[in-house]
Amino acid sequence: MKLTTFAPEFAEALPILEQIEAAGFEAYFVGGSVRDNLLGLPIHDVDIATSAYPAEIKQIFKRTVDTGIQHGTVMILDHGNGYEVTTFRTETGYQDFRRPDSVTFVRSLEEDLKRRDFTINALAMRADGEIIDLFDGIADLKAHKIRAVGVADERFHEDALRMMRAVRFESQLGFSVTETTQAAIEKHAALLEKIAIERIHVEFMKLMQGIERQNGLRTFIDTGLYRYCPDLADQLLALERLTALPTEQLHDESAVWLVVTYLLGQTPAQAGRFLKHWKSANDVIDAVKAGLVLLPKLLTATADQWDLYQAGQAVLVISLQIAQMVTTATIPTADWLERYDRLQIKQKADLAINGQILMQNGFQPGPILGKALAILERKVVLDELPNTTEALLKAAK
């Protein structure tokens, strides 16, 4: 197969390939960018593989940065954008089931592609658009299949995170893992315990945010991968409920964790501990905990202005999305958003009075002043007082 037109990302990087080839070496676009181009999807990162060793690349180009030279990767800065170029390599020994114990630079593209995870990611493209497909990756693209390169057992022993990548690609691309590859995942699922939680987190989040979330979740469950993720080992029923939800795509990380923790039946405190185990960011944890307070009130239509105010707009939006997913009842989303918009204040700083003004009018600093401000804040939110300095001062006195 030969492409006659190039995506802009490839066109911009072509001078890199041409300069390497002019020096007598091979160079190709490789990996996910080639796959996504063939699928008509947006290209995010352009990866280049070459037969030139790092020292040779640094002789060819004037401006380079050693971003991962021990693994053969050099960033080239000569043509505006930074492009990472990696020498063809083989890898041996995977004591931690994630990183190779040793890397050997080679001159063979085939040897380099053999070590890649899936056939759809083991594609290379020449500067003239010719696609190099040594493992039937194009056929698998057309069949919407995710198949390990070579022996699946070996690929997952080399890097156990690849098992999570498989189910993530199912979700992102709407593909299906082949029977042989799925059997290997089931066989080696326990190796996932060797992988850093942060890396599992990234893949799980991409799985949950994909266009075919149910596909990825189904394999995630059927292979037993879930048993080796933080606090999910005994949560099969909740995960099954997750697969049964409507297919609406989730874009926000907080929305993902809100629906997960809600279906797990967690309290805000339990969710906080759960998400700490998953190494989630503090702002995500805070949003999920707030969502777990608001969500049941949206489902029962019992939320008042104070509930909406405490949650804030961002939490309200994700809570409404999840509410629509977890119930067959109609959720009046527009009405809830309108009620939020009508709030006199959206945050404490919007209050027409503050501690300084109160002290100027006879209040002493201390707990009483803080309590007075809290009472005024609540009364304004609940429309029991107008948000004017005059009215609030009068009420405070």
Swiss-Prot record:
It comes from Latilactobacillus sakei subsp. sakei (strain 23K) (Lactobacillus sakei subsp. sakei). This is CCA-adding enzyme. A single active site specifically recognizes both ATP and CTP and is responsible for their addition. Its EC number is 2.7.7.72. InterPro entries: Bact_CCA-adding_enz_type3_sf, CCA-adding_enz_C, CCA-adding_enz_firmicutes, NT_sf, PolA_pol_head_dom, PolyA_RNA-bd. Pfam families: PolyA_pol (PF01743), PolyA_pol_RNAbd (PF12627), tRNA_NucTran2_2 (PF13735). SUPFAM superfamilies: Nucleotidyltransferase, Poly A polymerase C-terminal region-like. The keyword Nucleotidyltransferase applies. Keywords: ATP-binding, Magnesium, Metal-binding, Nucleotide-binding, Nucleotidyltransferase, RNA repair, RNA-binding, Transferase, tRNA processing. GO terms for molecular function: ATP binding; CCA tRNA nucleotidyltransferase activity; magnesium ion binding; tRNA binding. Mg(2+) binds at D45, D47. HAMAP family: CCA_bact_type3. ATP binds at G32, R35, R116, D159, R162, R165, R168. Catalyzes the addition and repair of the essential 3'-terminal CCA sequence in tRNAs without using a nucleic acid template. Adds these three nucleotides in the order of C, C, and A to the tRNA nucleotide-73, using CTP and ATP as substrates and producing inorganic pyrophosphate. tRNA 3'-terminal CCA addition is required both for tRNA processing and repair. Also involved in tRNA surveillance by mediating tandem CCA addition to generate a CCACCA at the 3' terminus of unstable tRNAs. While stable tRNAs receive only 3'-terminal CCA, unstable tRNAs are marked with CCACCA and rapidly degraded. GO terms for biological process: RNA repair; tRNA 3'-terminal CCA addition. The gene is cca. CTP binds at G32, R35, R116, D159, R162, R165, R168. Its cofactor is Mg(2+). It catalyses: a tRNA precursor + 2 CTP + ATP = a tRNA with a 3' CCA end + 3 diphosphate; a tRNA with a 3' CCA end + 2 CTP + ATP = a tRNA with a 3' CCACCA end + 3 diphosphate. Homodimer. Belongs to the tRNA nucleotidyltransferase/poly(A) polymerase family. Bacterial CCA-adding enzyme type 3 subfamily.
